[in-house]
Amino acid sequence: MTKAHSIGIGGESIATVHHSADSDRWLFFCHGFVSDKTGSYETRCERAVEEGYNAVRFDFRGSGDSDGKFIESTLSAKIADLRAVVEHFEPTRYALFGSSFGAKVAFHAAGAVRSALSPETIIARSPVTYNRTFDAYREIVEAEGILRYDADHAIDGRFFDDFAQYPFRSVTENLDVPVAIFHGSEDESVPIEDSFEAAAALNGDVLLEKYVGEGHRFSRTAEDRLRQRTFEWLASVVE
Protein backbone atom coordinates (compact mmCIF):
# COMPACT_ATOMS: atom_id res chain seq x y z
CA MET A 1 0.00 0.00 0.00
CA THR A 2 1.23 3.49 -0.81
CA LYS A 3 0.31 6.79 0.78
CA ALA A 4 1.24 10.29 -0.37
CA HIS A 5 2.49 12.78 2.21
CA SER A 6 3.11 16.51 1.99
CA ILE A 7 5.86 17.36 4.46
CA GLY A 8 6.26 20.98 5.46
CA ILE A 9 9.59 22.78 5.64
CA GLY A 10 10.22 26.52 5.62
CA GLY A 11 6.74 27.32 4.34
CA GLU A 12 7.10 24.88 1.44
CA SER A 13 6.16 21.22 1.01
CA ILE A 14 8.10 18.09 0.09
CA ALA A 15 6.12 15.61 -2.01
CA THR A 16 6.66 12.19 -0.46
CA VAL A 17 5.35 8.65 -1.00
CA HIS A 18 5.44 5.93 1.65
CA HIS A 19 5.31 2.29 0.54
CA SER A 20 4.26 0.50 3.72
CA ALA A 21 5.38 -2.85 5.11
CA ASP A 22 4.62 -4.63 8.37
CA SER A 23 8.09 -4.01 9.74
CA ASP A 24 10.20 -1.65 11.82
CA ARG A 25 12.82 -1.47 9.07
CA TRP A 26 12.86 1.57 6.78
CA LEU A 27 14.68 2.52 3.60
CA PHE A 28 14.70 6.13 2.36
CA PHE A 29 15.58 6.86 -1.28
CA CYS A 30 17.35 10.07 -2.39
CA HIS A 31 17.15 10.84 -6.11
CA GLY A 32 19.86 12.33 -8.29
CA PHE A 33 20.62 15.92 -9.22
CA VAL A 34 18.15 16.57 -12.06
CA SER A 35 15.99 13.53 -11.32
CA ASP A 36 12.87 12.98 -9.21
CA LYS A 37 11.12 10.27 -7.20
CA THR A 38 9.43 8.56 -10.17
CA GLY A 39 10.60 5.76 -12.46
CA SER A 40 13.19 3.46 -10.92
CA TYR A 41 12.53 4.85 -7.45
CA GLU A 42 8.98 3.56 -7.52
CA THR A 43 10.06 0.05 -8.49
CA ARG A 44 12.96 0.13 -6.03
CA CYS A 45 10.46 0.94 -3.29
CA GLU A 46 8.23 -1.90 -4.41
CA ARG A 47 11.20 -4.27 -4.20
CA ALA A 48 12.04 -2.92 -0.75
CA VAL A 49 8.54 -3.74 0.48
CA GLU A 50 8.92 -7.27 -0.88
CA GLU A 51 12.08 -7.52 1.20
CA GLY A 52 10.26 -6.37 4.33
CA TYR A 53 11.14 -2.67 4.37
CA ASN A 54 8.95 0.39 4.66
CA ALA A 55 10.18 2.43 1.71
CA VAL A 56 10.02 6.19 1.23
CA ARG A 57 10.74 8.19 -1.91
CA PHE A 58 10.46 11.96 -2.18
CA ASP A 59 11.26 14.94 -4.37
CA PHE A 60 13.81 17.41 -3.11
CA ARG A 61 12.47 20.95 -3.20
CA GLY A 62 12.77 22.35 -6.70
CA SER A 63 12.27 18.90 -8.23
CA GLY A 64 9.26 16.84 -9.25
CA ASP A 65 6.10 17.62 -7.32
CA SER A 66 7.73 19.45 -4.41
CA ASP A 67 7.57 23.19 -3.91
CA GLY A 68 10.47 25.52 -4.59
CA LYS A 69 12.78 26.45 -7.44
CA PHE A 70 15.60 24.17 -8.52
CA ILE A 71 18.04 27.07 -8.76
CA GLU A 72 17.52 27.71 -5.04
CA SER A 73 18.00 24.07 -4.03
CA THR A 74 21.50 23.94 -2.56
CA LEU A 75 23.14 20.93 -0.94
CA SER A 76 22.23 22.40 2.45
CA ALA A 77 18.59 22.61 1.37
CA LYS A 78 18.59 19.01 0.17
CA ILE A 79 20.12 17.81 3.44
CA ALA A 80 17.39 19.69 5.30
CA ASP A 81 14.76 18.06 3.07
CA LEU A 82 16.08 14.58 3.80
CA ARG A 83 16.16 15.22 7.53
CA ALA A 84 12.61 16.59 7.46
CA VAL A 85 11.37 13.48 5.66
CA VAL A 86 13.09 11.10 8.07
CA GLU A 87 11.86 13.04 11.10
CA HIS A 88 8.32 12.97 9.74
CA PHE A 89 8.20 9.17 9.84
CA GLU A 90 10.29 8.78 13.03
CA PRO A 91 11.78 5.38 12.17
CA THR A 92 13.47 3.48 14.97
CA ARG A 93 15.99 2.14 12.44
CA TYR A 94 16.61 2.90 8.80
CA ALA A 95 18.99 2.85 5.86
CA LEU A 96 19.60 5.47 3.18
CA PHE A 97 19.84 4.80 -0.56
CA GLY A 98 21.31 7.62 -2.61
CA SER A 99 21.86 7.76 -6.36
CA SER A 100 24.51 10.09 -7.80
CA PHE A 101 24.05 13.49 -6.10
CA GLY A 102 21.44 11.91 -3.84
CA ALA A 103 24.27 9.83 -2.39
CA LYS A 104 26.21 12.99 -1.57
CA VAL A 105 23.15 14.30 0.24
CA ALA A 106 22.88 11.03 2.18
CA PHE A 107 26.58 10.99 3.09
CA HIS A 108 26.63 14.54 4.42
CA ALA A 109 23.29 14.26 6.21
CA ALA A 110 24.47 11.12 7.97
CA GLY A 111 27.99 12.32 8.63
CA ALA A 112 27.14 15.68 10.15
CA VAL A 113 25.70 14.69 13.54
CA ARG A 114 25.27 11.25 15.09
CA SER A 115 21.88 11.01 16.78
CA ALA A 116 18.99 8.67 17.46
CA LEU A 117 17.79 9.47 13.93
CA SER A 118 21.06 8.58 12.20
CA PRO A 119 20.98 5.77 9.60
CA GLU A 120 22.32 2.30 10.25
CA THR A 121 23.73 1.97 6.73
CA ILE A 122 24.09 3.82 3.42
CA ILE A 123 23.78 2.41 -0.09
CA ALA A 124 25.28 4.59 -2.82
CA ARG A 125 24.85 4.10 -6.56
CA SER A 126 27.29 6.01 -8.79
CA PRO A 127 27.85 8.44 -5.91
CA VAL A 128 29.09 12.00 -6.07
CA THR A 129 31.68 12.10 -3.30
CA TYR A 130 34.49 14.57 -3.99
CA ASN A 131 33.51 18.10 -4.95
CA ARG A 132 35.87 18.08 -7.92
CA THR A 133 33.10 16.28 -9.82
CA PHE A 134 31.46 19.70 -10.21
CA ASP A 135 34.61 21.66 -11.14
CA ALA A 136 33.67 22.00 -14.82
CA TYR A 137 30.19 23.24 -13.87
CA ARG A 138 31.69 25.73 -11.41
CA GLU A 139 33.94 27.14 -14.14
CA ILE A 140 30.93 27.70 -16.38
CA VAL A 141 29.06 29.49 -13.60
CA GLU A 142 32.10 31.65 -12.84
CA ALA A 143 32.35 32.61 -16.52
CA GLU A 144 28.68 32.98 -17.41
CA GLY A 145 26.89 33.47 -14.08
CA ILE A 146 24.53 30.55 -14.59
CA LEU A 147 24.51 27.01 -15.93
CA ARG A 148 21.30 25.75 -17.53
CA TYR A 149 20.83 22.01 -17.86
CA ASP A 150 17.40 22.39 -19.44
CA ALA A 151 14.29 24.57 -19.15
CA ASP A 152 13.61 23.40 -15.59
CA HIS A 153 17.08 23.01 -14.11
CA ALA A 154 19.79 25.64 -13.60
CA ILE A 155 22.39 26.52 -10.97
CA ASP A 156 24.25 29.73 -10.18
CA GLY A 157 26.86 30.98 -7.74
CA ARG A 158 24.65 30.32 -4.73
CA PHE A 159 24.94 26.61 -5.32
CA PHE A 160 28.75 26.67 -5.27
CA ASP A 161 28.99 29.06 -2.32
CA ASP A 162 27.04 26.48 -0.34
CA PHE A 163 28.70 23.44 -1.93
CA ALA A 164 32.14 24.54 -0.73
CA GLN A 165 31.03 23.89 2.86
CA TYR A 166 30.80 20.15 2.19
CA PRO A 167 34.16 18.57 1.36
CA PHE A 168 34.06 14.78 1.46
CA ARG A 169 36.64 14.76 4.25
CA SER A 170 33.87 15.95 6.60
CA VAL A 171 32.15 12.64 5.87
CA THR A 172 35.25 10.49 6.27
CA GLU A 173 36.02 12.18 9.59
CA ASN A 174 32.58 11.57 11.08
CA LEU A 175 30.77 8.70 9.36
CA ASP A 176 31.35 5.18 10.69
CA VAL A 177 28.31 3.19 9.51
CA PRO A 178 28.60 0.41 6.91
CA VAL A 179 28.46 1.67 3.32
CA ALA A 180 27.81 -0.17 0.05
CA ILE A 181 28.92 1.47 -3.20
CA PHE A 182 27.90 0.28 -6.66
CA HIS A 183 29.62 2.05 -9.58
CA GLY A 184 29.93 1.52 -13.32
CA SER A 185 33.41 1.24 -14.81
CA GLU A 186 32.45 3.50 -17.73
CA ASP A 187 30.73 6.24 -15.73
CA GLU A 188 31.04 9.39 -17.83
CA SER A 189 29.79 11.75 -15.10
CA VAL A 190 31.48 10.53 -11.92
CA PRO A 191 34.70 8.54 -12.41
CA ILE A 192 34.75 5.21 -10.61
CA GLU A 193 38.19 6.12 -9.25
CA ASP A 194 36.43 8.56 -6.91
CA SER A 195 34.54 5.67 -5.34
CA PHE A 196 37.72 3.65 -4.84
CA GLU A 197 39.29 6.67 -3.13
CA ALA A 198 36.18 7.26 -1.02
CA ALA A 199 36.01 3.61 0.04
CA ALA A 200 39.61 3.72 1.23
CA ALA A 201 38.98 6.93 3.18
CA LEU A 202 35.74 5.94 4.95
CA ASN A 203 36.08 4.76 8.55
CA GLY A 204 33.47 1.99 8.55
CA ASP A 205 33.06 -1.22 6.61
CA VAL A 206 32.66 -0.66 2.87
CA LEU A 207 31.41 -2.93 0.11
CA LEU A 208 32.46 -1.62 -3.31
CA GLU A 209 31.31 -3.33 -6.50
CA LYS A 210 32.52 -2.35 -9.97
CA TYR A 211 29.99 -2.94 -12.75
CA VAL A 212 32.05 -3.52 -15.86
CA GLY A 213 30.79 -1.68 -18.94
CA GLU A 214 28.13 0.29 -17.08
CA GLY A 215 27.88 4.08 -17.30
CA HIS A 216 26.36 6.61 -14.91
CA ARG A 217 22.93 5.21 -15.72
CA PHE A 218 22.69 1.47 -15.20
CA SER A 219 21.27 -0.96 -17.72
CA ARG A 220 18.26 -3.04 -16.72
CA THR A 221 20.53 -6.01 -16.04
CA ALA A 222 22.80 -3.94 -13.81
CA GLU A 223 19.81 -2.42 -12.02
CA ASP A 224 18.46 -5.89 -11.27
CA ARG A 225 21.85 -6.92 -9.93
CA LEU A 226 22.06 -3.74 -7.86
CA ARG A 227 18.75 -4.48 -6.18
CA GLN A 228 19.64 -8.09 -5.47
CA ARG A 229 23.01 -7.20 -4.01
CA THR A 230 21.58 -4.30 -1.99
CA PHE A 231 19.23 -6.50 -0.02
CA GLU A 232 21.71 -9.34 0.33
CA TRP A 233 24.18 -6.85 1.78
CA LEU A 234 21.61 -5.25 4.07
CA ALA A 235 20.74 -8.68 5.44
CA SER A 236 24.40 -9.25 6.24
CA VAL A 237 25.03 -5.98 8.10
CA VAL A 238 21.69 -5.18 9.77
CA GLU A 239 20.42 -7.36 12.59
Segments the model singles out, each with a brief description of its role:
Residues 174-176, 181-183, 187:
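Short beta-strand/loop motif that positions the catalytic acidic residue
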Residues 24-32:
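Short beta-strand element of the alpha/beta-hydrolase
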Residues 33-46, 193:
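The serine-hydrolase catalytic nucleophile loop
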Residues 214-227:
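Catalytic histidine-centered segment of alpha/beta-hydrolase-like enzymes
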Residues 48-67:
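Conserved alpha/beta-hydrolase
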Residues 1-22:
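N-terminal cap/lid segment of alpha/beta-hydrolase-fold proteins
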Residues 115-155:
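Hydrolase active-site cap/lid region
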